[in-house]
Amino acid sequence: MSLSIPKIENGAAGDLEVSDKVFGQGFNESLVHQLVVGYLAAARSGTKAQKSRSDVSGGGKKPWKQKGSGHARAGTTRSPLWRTGGVTFAASNRNYRQKLNKKMYRAAVRSIFSELLRQGRLVVSDGIVPTSPKTRELAAKLKSFGEGYTVILAEQLDLNLALSSRNLPNVSINTADTLSPVDLVHAERVIATSSAIRKLEVRLS
């Protein structure tokens, strides 16, 4: 069984036959959520660090005797109550990455693309890739598809496409090998090239 993705070239409408094994799957919300959360978590640096009372210098000696000095009792200058003391609940380096195996990743991406096709947010247009780095040319092409956040999906990174789109708001470039699930989920529409769709079929099947 095969499905059809709307294909628009120079104002003429057509269809691109695709496999339902990739673009005809049910929407698994929990799996897609796990993919998006894992993707965002992996982007966190996790390098925030503070010094606790065990990390700051000094404090090996009791500042003054327990009684008779008139001061409040103290056992160390590293106490969080002191100006030069450590932080009570100090932040430490942390790896935020979450495990998501290849089988789950592919299933989640298939689910996203299937839902995009069902909602009419996925179209194919080979002419979307400009032949020269002209922002005005790309903006005019995108305008014909409507307004809103748009993801352009190419088979591989194209220099003309990257240069033409970098100054356009609400436009993101993805390739078949470097997909951003966050971009795909938030996109009003995804405009893909035929070669990118074929590469996805091979990669996700």
Curated annotation (Swiss-Prot):
SUPFAM superfamilies: Ribosomal protein L4 (SSF52166). This is Large ribosomal subunit protein uL4. Keywords: Ribonucleoprotein, Ribosomal protein, RNA-binding, rRNA-binding. It holds the Pfam family Ribosomal_L4. GO terms for cellular component: ribonucleoprotein complex; ribosome. One of the primary rRNA binding proteins, this protein initially binds near the 5'-end of the 23S rRNA. It is important during the early stages of 50S assembly. It makes multiple contacts with different domains of the 23S rRNA in the assembled 50S subunit and ribosome. Transmembrane segments: none annotated. It comes from the Bacteria.
